[in-house]
Structure formats: structure tokens, C-alpha cells
Swiss-Prot record:
Protein name: Large ribosomal subunit protein bL28
Organism: Streptococcus sanguinis (strain SK36)
Protein family per UniProt: Belongs to the bacterial ribosomal protein bL28 family.
Pfam families, per database record: Ribosomal_L28 (PF00830)
GO molecular function, one term: structural constituent of ribosome
CC annotations in GO: ribonucleoprotein complex; ribosome
Disulfide bond entries: none
UniProt record, GO biological process: translation
UniProt xrefs under PANTHER family: 50S RIBOSOMAL PROTEIN L28, LARGE RIBOSOMAL SUBUNIT PROTEIN BL28A
Keyword RNA-binding appears in the UniProt entry: no
Keyword set includes Ribosomal protein: yes
Domain of life from the UniProt record: Bacteria
Keywords: Ribonucleoprotein, Ribosomal protein
Amino acid sequence: MAKVCYFTGRKTVSGNNRSHAMNQTKRAVKPNLQKVTVLIDGKPKKVWASARALKSGKVERV
């Protein structure tokens, strides 16, 4: 299962590191994903949920 938020679709995005000399190298910006158990179709299932989704109340935990 990919590390993508089940509720908001947030996932890893790419960006650049910039040195003082303005050299650039690729870096990954990862979301704060937590493994939570939720009810999906009446059955408990473990899914990835972003911290933002958890705090905003979009997730109904078991």
C-alpha cells in the first residue's frame, strides 16, 4: 500500500535543496502520515491518514 493519505490524498512531493552557492539537489517533502484503524464499509481497516485529516475531524477512528 502506497504512503498516501486515504482521506485527503496527501503524498510525498519533490523539491530542491539549495546550498549557499545556489546549487540544487532533489529532496523529498513527506507528509505526516499516521497508520490508523477506521471503519470502511462496516469493517475495521488500517489505512494511512495525514495528521491534518486527523486534527480536522475527517477521520472516525474505531
